[in-house]
């Protein structure tokens, strides 16, 4: 959807079988606001969910699995919430980039593996909350690069290569009450 307002994308099964050079995104939102993306299953695409310049949108109870790149690729999109989604076996995991005021709660990021893969990447993101998520069996569990004033609380990071990579350009974060179990680093 492009330049859409107050629409609902719900209860769909969207399967792809493309290769990286030809595959598109399953659900692609651009310059949209007040959207609801709920109860979808997407697999086999370039990116399962791709959002750019999206505002005030709720992403809830979706499954994004076996995509070539990202389960979710999210940029320049403010005031959005991600709750109770499952991101499984994607090529690179989930990337939330260049944004602020995001809530990421009670999601599962699992088995996103590869040379540049992570469960969840927070890049140049601020004033956001990551709470109650399960981040398990990823190359890197949680990578924070250029993230500031984040609250990372009550997450479980288990059986990842690196549990948490926090880069030096990520100041003023609160990381508390998390469980780290069985990670390599």
Question: Where are the model-predicted features located?
Answer:
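A compositional/structural signature marking long, glycine- and acidic/polar-rich segments
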Residues: 126-165
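Short low-complexity stretches enriched in small and charged residues
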Residues: 48-52, 58-63
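Parallel beta-helix/beta-solenoid
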Residues: 3-4, 9, 27, 31-32, ...
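Leucine-rich solenoid repeat scaffolds
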Residues: 166-185
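Extracellular beta-strand/beta-solenoid scaffold signature
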Residues: 1, 20-31, 44-50, 66-73, ...
């Amino acid at each position: 959807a492009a330049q859409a307002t107050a629409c609902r994308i719900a209860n769909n099964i969207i399967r792809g079988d493309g290769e990286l050079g030809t595959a598109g995104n399953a659900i692609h939102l651009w310059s949209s606001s007040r959207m609801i993306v709920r109860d979808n299953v997407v697999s086999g695409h370039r990116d399962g969910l791709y959002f750019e310049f999206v505002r005030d949108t709720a992403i809830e109870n979706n499954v994004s699995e076996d995509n070539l790149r990202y389960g979710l690729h999210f940029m320049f999109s403010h005031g959005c919430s991600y709750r109770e989604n499952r991101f499984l076996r994607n090529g690179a995991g989930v990337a939330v980039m260049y944004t602020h005021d995001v809530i990421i709660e009670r999601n599962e990021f699992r088995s996103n593996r590869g040379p540049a893969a992570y469960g969840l990447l927070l890049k140049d993101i601020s004033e956001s909350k990551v709470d109650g998520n399960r981040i398990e069996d990823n190359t890197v569990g949680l990578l924070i690069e250029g993230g500031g004033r984040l609250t990372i609380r009550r997450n479980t990071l288990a059986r990842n290569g690196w549990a948490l990579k926090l880069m030096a350009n990520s100041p003023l974060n609160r990381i508390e009450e998390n469980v780290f179990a069985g990670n390599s680093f």
